[in-house]
Amino acid sequence: MGLQCGIVGLPNVGKSTLFNCLSNAKAQAANFPFCTIEPNVGVITVPDERLNKLSELVIPERVVPTVIEIVDIAGLVKGASKGEGLGNKFLGNIRETNAIIHVLRCFDDGNVVHVDGSVNPIRDKETIDYELQLKDLESVDKKLQKSEKMAKTGDKDGRREVEFLTIFKKHLEQGKSARSAPVEGKDRDVIDDIHLLTDKPVLYVCNVDEASVVNGNKYSEIVKEAVKAEGAEVLLISAAIESEIASLESPEDRQSFLADLGLTEPGVNKLIKAAYRLLNLSTYFTAGVKEVRAWTITKGMTAPQAAGVIHTDFEKGFIKAETIKYNDFVKFGSEAAARENGKLSIEGKEYVVGDGDVMHFRFNV
């Protein structure tokens, strides 16, 4: 299952520095606007201690973690929706992502210029929100015009679309994002085909200085208060610290560095886990001598759907799923031992896969 998060923010908020820490790709982190001319795409390995533990027990030929794609979207500026700065092209890049990671500058540094001349994360957030909302309003307007023509012919679908698109339009005109529009459940399908930017789930990252990475600062507190109503998660990360961690070769050095700062894990790990929560994802495992592998699924997926993530044939010809809970696998040390102790269950088509399940699918095509 592909998962793509777009990192957005005004120029010089620490977006590309954070991206460099997250991925194997290296964007040019320069102290001037628009250093990210093309959207950089990086692939992040999702850290999971359970995968490491299973690998120790099974000793496979290879270990395959699950990954997340991160896209570094060029710095947006006022007027982006009208083509200013790098404009429409990059709003299009955001449209292709599953979720938005919004980086806000929450540190003072006279050596790093700010496009608006001062540090104000709420102003920065509102600038980005406004540009995305304007672009969404344009998309809703276009579809609404088509739906109104259909409605005039007596088309039921057209009338329904007009009703709910009008709600989205009014909501956006009030300077609010589509994700908070008062439209529930299946009625939101009227916007499925136009992929509204502000309907995507969002995670806010406060890029703070080293001294504020544990408890935050005045800027991050303002951000937390401002996004309360959205119900969005806010993370404290120091891109500068993450850069230092990434430059350390040994795990021991990294752990020692983190401990000195009062941290238990790198900020990028917290960010990846938060992205999982944001998209309602979970992980199951396959474990054999050839390969131990982590697979990403959406929470609530049934066994056949989870099997389909490996290959569509697995879903089409699904017969059953031999399932061991992760804790049982670790407790008994192997699939055979778990089976002997009655901890291997045979699950059918209705089984909802649990996070951490170790699975073996039987199928016939």
Each predicted region: which residue ranges?
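C-terminal-of-GTPase-core extension/linker across diverse P-loop GTPases
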Residues: 2-8, 13, 19, 146-352, ...
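Amphipathic alpha-helical transducer elements in NTP-driven molecular machines
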Residues: 34, 48-51, 64-70, 84-98, ...
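Conserved Switch II/interswitch segment of TRAFAC-class P-loop GTPases
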Residues: 42-47, 74-84, 95-156, 171-184, ...
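Short amphipathic alpha-helical segments
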Residues: 30-31, 112-116, 216-218, 248
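Conserved G1/Walker A P-loop phosphate-binding module
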Residues: 1-113, 141-142, 147
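Short, flexible surface segments
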Residues: 96, 354-355
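A ubiquitous short alpha-helical element
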Residues: 58, 128-132, 239
